Regions:
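Catalytic cores of alpha/beta
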Residues: 57-60, 120-128, 170-185
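C-terminal accessory extensions appended to soluble enzyme cores
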Residues: 191-245
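Active-site-adjacent beta->alpha loops and helix N-cap segments on the catalytic face
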Residues: 25-35, 87-101, 118-122, 140-156, ...
Length: 245
């Protein structure tokens, strides 16, 4: 589950197995709950940070942000955390320098995030150097559905190398068949934002949309209900995992 920071009550009561949260948004109550989850993944929140800075017209202090990220990881002994994959903003060479500092000052390997712009050779290199990598670009449409077959083959390659792959922003029905070790997205909030609702029917999530021109009742109630249902779905998917590593 990703983006659960505003839903303390539901998360505490229903206890998801796996949680991803952005460093930019993470709350103290989530830190308290971490030990109860099977796995916690920390996203750098770099894009959110950058957009906030852009709105204020201030220069982006990447060194300062990275320093705070490192401090949080060390203070709370975070085991799984992503690099600052801001290639399209600062270039991949700068990303690699930040990754090197991140790993040197935490004493742990980060989860690098492969983007299509990095190329096939870099994907293979990451598979040689890291036990756990991410693939980004689904949520922002840099990877189109017509390219999913290619991505599936990349994941198969990584699995054959014994590498775990996280699909960032991908929770479609066929996520299990990709061979991803883990996936995340904030899909659980999407239909709620547009007035709809989603529920787990025992094997998949079903979306219920309001009649045209109407918006569903109380947003908070729908959001809490949707999160509960997605936690059920998460636990179901956990029994269906097909990671081959």
């Amino acid at each position: 589950m990703a983006g659960t920071f505003p839903a303390e009550k539901v998360v505490r009561e229903n206890r998801p197995e796996y949680v991803l949260e952005s460093f930019f948004y993470i709350k103290p109550w989530q830190v308290e709950e971490m030990s109860k989850w099977k796995m916690f993944l920390l996203d750098s929140g770099a894009f959110t940070f950058m957009h906030g800075i852009e709105a204020s017209s201030k220069p982006v202090d990447w060194d300062g942000y990275l320093g705070r990220y490192i401090d949080f990881i060390n203070r709370h002994d975070i085991q799984h955390f992503f690099e600052l994959d801001v290639d399209i903003i600062v270039g991949y060479d700068a990303v690699k320098r930040m990754r090197a500092r991140l790993e040197a000052e935490t004493g742990k390997k980060s989860i690098p995030v492969w983007h299509r712009s990095r190329g096939l050779d870099e994907f293979k290199r990451l598979c040689r150097d890291y036990p756990y990598i991410g693939i980004g670009g689904f949520a922002i449409k840099h990877i189109q559905p017509s390219e999913y077959g290619y991505i599936r083959r990349l994941v198969q390659y990584a699995n054959a190398c014994g590498v775990r792959v996280h699909g960032l922003g991908y929770t479609k029905k066929d996520a299990v068949d990709f061979g991803f070790y883990s996936v995340d997205s904030t899909t659980w909030t999407t239909q709620v934002n547009f007035g709809g609702l989603s529920y787990f029917n025992g094997s998949e999530m079903v979306v219920v949309r309001p009649p045209k021109g109407m918006i569903g009742a109380d947003y908070r109630i729908r959001r809490e209900y949707a999160l509960k249902e997605w936690i059920k779905y998460q636990k179901y998917l956990d029994t269906k995992g097909k990671w081959r590593g």
